[in-house]
Amino acid sequence: MSVVERIWWGHRAAPGEAVLLAPLLLAEGLFRAGAAARGALYDSGLLAQARAGVPVISIGNVAVGGAGKTPAAIAVSARLAARGRRVAVLSRGYGASRRDARVVSDGAHVLLGAGEAGDEPALLARRLPGVAVLCGPRRAALAATAVTTLGADALVLDDGFQHRALARDLDVVVLDAANPFGNGHLLPRGPNREPRAALRRAGLVWLSRVDQADEVALEALRALALEATGRAPVESRHAPVDVVDGTLARSLGREALRGARVLALSGLARPGAFRRTLADLGAEVVGERAFPDHHRFTDRELDEALRAAEAAGARAVTTEKDAVRLAPARAADPRLCAVRIDAELVRGEDHLAQSLDAALARGDVLSRSAG
């Protein structure tokens, strides 16, 4: 974790690092002013929002990275598909080698991997059979393609809370209950894209990793969500549902790591959460190689991690999101496996169902009115 990231997530700056704070505070003020001005333009209608012609549900967050948006997007998309909807997920495609609009999955076939699409769209495509996944910088254009070309009648906007150019019928904001706002500052002084007051735009707050949160802090977050949205939050835990080989094609069984010595290999915003997941599976974490979020492991880095694991009498274990970035030959290495995570709802399933149904009804009415 870099010096700036440690400051973001509430670690005290060392004496030699405190010199970074002054320029970061100045930059934070500029960022705050820009974000406020842009938000005011949308709030006033001076910046217009495009309508997709079908219901749109956004999954987003306030802080950058690691809140649990991807498991939430998978859970919401699956629930919409279970309602008989033809669902398409629209993602920016962070880390992709191409910046044009791309169909990652048409719902029947996965067409692109993580290299061209980015790790999150590639993972969504693999985890959501029957759901289309598109990626590109202009979500309004992706929406048009999803509706007119792929026949989608419901859209999930991945990481869409700040992407206000596309109108939505429900904003779901995901907060990591264990550390929702870091040090409380905006970028680049802290991890937040907007002040927490932005939660008033949300229709539903989703608290992830509630099993890792302090109960007093959790009660405060529940009160914050209720005050902001008028509705109690959805609450979930990151549940490890399977251990799979590095190609993600073969299940090794959820108990495969119980009692095993492992080296945690990840490219995540919050690697500590992955270590806790491994502990929950009964593994003994004897080493770690943690890289920045969306990092693509080089051959040298992967070889070093595998050698270190072998030297410690351990197995290298990575996340499903990291594994999709691996070249097929490297993913097939038998010394490597991955953990598959789902968002397991522990509270608020009824709130989620009501919010989704209301958003679908609202979007359908607006679509008929526009037509």
UniProtKB/Swiss-Prot annotation:
It is an enzyme of class 2 (transferase). Pfam families: LpxK (PF02606). InterPro entries: LpxK, P-loop_NTPase. One of its GO terms (molecular function) is tetraacyldisaccharide 4'-kinase activity. Pathway: Glycolipid biosynthesis; lipid IV(A) biosynthesis; lipid IV(A) from (3R)-3-hydroxytetradecanoyl-[acyl-carrier-protein] and UDP-N-acetyl-alpha-D-glucosamine: step 6/6. It catalyses: a lipid A disaccharide + ATP = a lipid IVA + ADP + H(+). Its EC number is 2.7.1.130. ATP binds at residues 63-70. GO terms for cellular component: plasma membrane. Keywords: ATP-binding, Kinase, Lipid A biosynthesis, Lipid biosynthesis, Lipid metabolism, Nucleotide-binding, Transferase. Belongs to the LpxK family. NCBIfam families: lpxK (TIGR00682). Transfers the gamma-phosphate of ATP to the 4'-position of a tetraacyldisaccharide 1-phosphate intermediate (termed DS-1-P) to form tetraacyldisaccharide 1,4'-bis-phosphate (lipid IVA). HAMAP family: LpxK. This is Tetraacyldisaccharide 4'-kinase.
